[in-house]
From Swiss-Prot:
Protein name: Serralysin
Family: Belongs to the peptidase M10B family.
GO molecular function, one term: metalloendopeptidase activity
Residues holding Ca(2+) 2: 301, 303, 340, 342
Length: 486
């Protein structure tokens, strides 16, 4: 087909276009808009979304006195676990107690989770006088406090984080991954780093804060930030009673705006989920009953979301700032802004895999999957089951960056171009012809008997060129009936 290439043409797919496609293509469109307020019909939008949601967490510009504006250098903070009552213990709490070893280990994991995303060097010290951040328990609170911490100020060299020892969340499995106690450690440490609640509410308010009455913008939920008081269900997600152990989407953006990013962590090929090499419990799935809740921060390499051990129907989206439904939860996995995850592996359910602009490798696994590579030269596997490979525009597989479909089974799998954008001149839709004549929407199917590769191409008009569409399908000859054209 090289002879068809010549002139360049511009065309792109429009989400707002008035189109009707197949059931699978429309399901893909639905998931491309998932968790976007105003586009996802499952979300009741009580507050307007904010373009500055992450900045709201640092709206007070709280900073340490020894902090400068050079974010290229790691900022050092020392911390300690108090062993005795300090002289300046807050007036409204009493009956001090120290952290035990398990509690210390959990708090250190929360500290580590902040160091993973920000250019901060945390150093443990046993000298309480030189510590910037202290950890301690209390048994009695005149104000009924569960936990609290202080925000940094230029005149302060030490801040305390305090936790109610009588709360069961700090004495049982709740300080393990996904527990409320573990999230509390992460939340209070966030305060000592300068992060506020998303709006001006607090547990000490006379009237208990609620999302409806206290949130000032849409993203004030535990799907976007560990600094929120409000359930992720308010923004469309559902974590089934678990809590994030590490900073989430807006936390990461906010903390990096203050301290700079950790640009050295996970710079190699990283696997999240099953077969994880992250050495982080919140990024790791051990069996089909594992529950994942995280925002991925990654700085390089060829990286993979491996959710192969789950049996539920999953929706895996590799685009930055997107949310995925993984392992039976809703919107529980997200990707930090500026991060590229290249690959995804689905499980044994009927999954939807959505690629990004990179060269993705997408593997659906068992089940009847929908595979969408997006831009970039992608390698696609449907796996067992009746799989559908969807294309929406020529930019998703141009001749010089062709996709490869590796395990297509004629009579079972489908290639769906029912929503393929042909521009204003392509009202006739995609249709098969024996040879290109220059008409918009003409499609040609060829088979190379030597290489055992099918070539499927669509012309956008005129002589076939580098801006048209061409995908390679490995295996036995496929038929026109294997395609969904409308």
């Amino acid at each position: 087909m090289e002879k068809y290439m010549s002139l360049k043409k511009k065309i792109s797919y429009s989400e707002d276009k008035d189109v009707s496609g197949s059931e699978k293509a429309n399901e893909l469109l639905k998931w491309l808009q998932a968790y976007i307020p105003g586009k996802d019909s499952n979300i009741v939008v009580e507050h307007e979304p904010s373009k500055d949601a992450a900045k709201e967490l640092i709206r007070g510009d709280y900073r340490w006195g020894h902090q400068d504006d050079d974010k290229s250098k790691a900022f050092q903070l020392k911390y300690t676990f108090l062993e005795s009552k300090p002289d300046d213990m807050p007036w409204h709490i009493s009956e001090f107690s120290a952290f035990n070893e398990k509690q210390k280990a959990a708090a250190k994991l929360s500290i580590q989770s902040w160091a993973d995303v920000a250019n901060i060097n945390f150093v443990e010290t046993t000298d309480a006088k030189e510590a910037n951040i202290t950890f301690g328990f209390f048994d009695v609170s005149l104000t009924g406090s569960y936990a609290f911490a202080y925000l940094p100020r230029p005149e302060k060299t030490q801040l305390g984080t305090w936790y109610n020892a009588k709360s069961r969340t700090f004495s049982n499995n709740d300080i393990d991954v996904n527990g409320y106690g573990r999230q509390t450690f992460t939340h209070e440490i966030g305060h000592t780093l300068g992060l506020q609640h998303p709006a001006d509410y607090n547990a000490s308010d006379e009237v208990s804060p609620t999302y409806k009455n206290s949130a000032t913008y849409f993203e004030d939920s535990r799907a976007y930030t560990v600094m929120s008081y409000f359930s992720e269900k308010n923004t469309g997600q559902d974590f089934k009673g678990i809590y994030s152990s590490a900073p989430l989407l807006n936390d990461i953006s906010a903390i990096q705006a203050v301290y700079g990013a950790n640009n050295t962590i996970r710079a190699d090929d990283t696997v999240y989920g099953f077969n994880s090499n992250t050495d982080r419990d919140f990024y790791t799935a051990k069996d089909e009953n594992s529950k994942l809740l995280f925002t991925a921060w990654d700085t390089g390499g060829n990286d993979t979301f491996d959710f192969s051990g789950f049996t539920q129907d999953q929706r895996i989206n590799l685009n930055e700032a997107s949310f995925s439904d993984v392992g039976g939860l809703k919107g529980n996995v997200s990707i930090a802004r500026g991060v590229t995850i290249e690959n995804a592996i689905g499980g044994s359910g009927n999954d939807v895999l959505i690629g990004n602009d990179a060269a993705n490798t997408l593997k659906g696994g068992a089940g009847d999957d929908i595979i969408y590579g997006g831009l970039g030269a992608d390698n696609l596997w449907g796996g067992e089951g009746k799989d559908t490979f969807v294309y929406l525009s020529a930019k998703e597989s141009p001749p010089l960056e062709r996709d490869w479909i590796h395990d297509f089974v004629s009579g079972e799998d489908k290639i769906d171009v029912s929503l393929f954008d042909l521009g204003e001149a392509g009202k006739g839709g995609v249709r098969f012809v024996r040879e290109f004549t220059g008409e918009v929407g003409e499609a040609v199917l060829r088979y190379n008997t030597v290489d055992k590769v099918n070539d499927f191409a669509i012309n956008l008009g005129g002589e076939f060129s580098y801006d048209d569409f061409w995908v390679k399908i490995v295996g036995e000859p496929i038929l026109e009936s294997d395609f969904i054209l409308s």
